[in-house]
Amino acid sequence: MSEKFQAVVIGGGPGGYVCAIRLAQLGLKTACIESRGSLGGTCLNVGCIPSKSLLNLSEEFHKVQNLSSKGIEVGEVKLNLEKMMKSKDKAVTILTKGVEFLLKKNKVTYFKGLGSLKSKNEILIKDDQNKEIIIEAEKTVIATGSVPVSLPGIEIDEKIIVSSTGALKLDKVPKKMVVVGGGYIGLEMGSVWSRLGAEVQVVEFLDHITPGMDKEISSEFMKILKKQGIKFNMQNKVETIKKSNSGAVVSTVDKDGNKNNFDCDVVLISVGRKPNTEGLNLESAGVELDEKKRIKTDKTFKTNVHNVFAIGDVIDGPMLAHKAEDEGIAVAENIAGQSGHVNYDTIPGVVYTSPEVASIGKTEEQLKQANVNYKTGKFSFMANSRAKAIDDAEGFVKILADEKTDKVLGAHIIGPHAGELIAEIGIAMEFGASSEDIARTCHAHPTFSEAVKEAALSVDKRAIHS
């Protein structure tokens, strides 16, 4: 007899394991299936967490080389990349084991193996020894995430031509690295290896980096990265990538038809991700996909099959771990008969470079396109006492508010701890706050958060320190 569950989650990433825990909290007999062998998905294993570890460690390496100008004399600074990688891996191991403990604590049955639909109520699980079992599910949630995509005709070998996964595991610092794609992931990984000593060239098809970001922020971001030594080749299309004895040659053509060749040791392909739906056997249950191979769902995350749901990177929307987490909680509550929902207007996005970049809500470009009348408030970190005190004052805060109602419509930050500061704006937007609500909230001094308050004051031209 097959074991029966009230709910089964296929995928143990941020969306999947959070969904499974919430389902169990709500009293459902729940199982979670993960093929990787460790929980946490791309984010924890080969994405958010290991990349943040390397971003932090590379920043510390960079800072310590410049301490003498601050009155701290140090000896010769050496990089031990092997130890750095071990530190990164240790953080990942601790966190993945922590997630497994949470499933056990909440009495979620954890299956290690590849889950696929045998029918709308049956799930086939195949482990790494090809042993198969079948379980039954009253409700199934698909949360299998996404995988990196390459360019047509270019094979990623994770040695010379790498994805973000391979870029996290290099065994030596490349002398030259080409990053194909000027999005969040490419710029994060490019900045890591730049700080560790690589000469980094970014090749981008568009005329600006970080597509979808507020263009004023994007422009300032590129200026700062250029000052840090990263070189940009905009409006360049990659034609070929050919391996050579020493690495690879990336051949491009620019908007004027000029051809360029970039020699490098490593090429990082960072041109996006695609839903990970292969091998799920969705057709056996009749689950429909859209033209981009994403699973079609309604507002409750239900597919066209009444008892099959989907969340995270396999459905429409930004491919972000925290978006998947929110959807995981919402779909669990919907399955349990509650009214789970996600406010997609308040999902932040963060680039964890130095300085950090964070955005939430609408950009100026989006508001103009929608013919929304708005007002803007900006405040530079150059006038923020905490930022100046620690000599980390590049960037600014920008708040966008409705011209009539003063309701906060969006915010964009480039500067120290932007990823933390954006949360204040998220709370404000969730509760429909105005820029004046933020401006009249007392912020501790001296803190970076005062820049948010000053930007809010600036919306009505009342900033004190600018």
Predicted features along the sequence, with ranges:
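FAD-site-proximal beta/loop scaffold in flavoenzymes
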Residues: D157-V173, N260-I335
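Short hydrophobic core segments
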Residues: V8-I10, G115, I135-G145, V180, ...
